[in-house]
UniProtKB/Swiss-Prot annotation:
Molecular function terms, GO-annotated: hydrolase activity
Stated family: Belongs to the AB hydrolase superfamily. Methylesterase family.
The keyword Hydrolase is assigned to this record: yes
Boundaries of every AB hydrolase-1 domain copy: 5-108
Record has Metal-binding as a keyword: no
BP GO terms, sorted: embryo development ending in seed dormancy
Family matches, as InterPro entries: AB_hydrolase_1, AB_hydrolase_fold, MES/HNL
Organism: Arabidopsis thaliana (Mouse-ear cress)
Gene3D superfamilies linked to this entry: alpha/beta hydrolase
Keywords from the UniProt entry: Hydrolase
Record protein name field: Putative inactive methylesterase 20
Gene name linked to the record: MES20
Amino acid sequence: MKHYVLVHGGCHGAWCWYKVKPVLEASGHRVTVVDLTASGVNMSKVEEIQTLADYAKPLLEVLESFGSEDKVILVAHSLGGISVGLAADMFPSKISVAVFITSFMPDTTNPHLFMFSKSFVGALWSLRHMGHMIVL
C-alpha cells in the first residue's frame, strides 16, 4: 500500500481530485488531499498570504504530522508544483517521489523558487485578482 498526497493547482481545491482519490483508494492505497491556504474549503483570506510558506502551510503541516517512517508519493498539479517543491526541500525524508502533472517543477540546480525570484509578488497579485473573477 502506498500513500499519496494530492496537491491542487491555482484557483482550485482538494475537490479537484474527487475522481482520482476513490480510484487510488479502491486499489488499496491511502490518499490525502490538501486544501492549500485560501483555497477550497480553507477559510483563510488570500490577502493573508505573504510568502510561499504561508500558501503551502496546510501541506507542510500534513507532512509534518506523518511519522518519520512514513514516505509519501507527492502529486502536484499546475501551481501546486511550487508548494510541492518547497515541501520536498523541507521534508526530503518523508517523500519517496514527487510527481508533477502539467506543473511548475523545480530544477536540480536552482532553488525551488528561482523562476519566481523577481516576480513572486506579481504572481500573488495575479492570483488575488484572478480569484475575484472566478465564479464557480
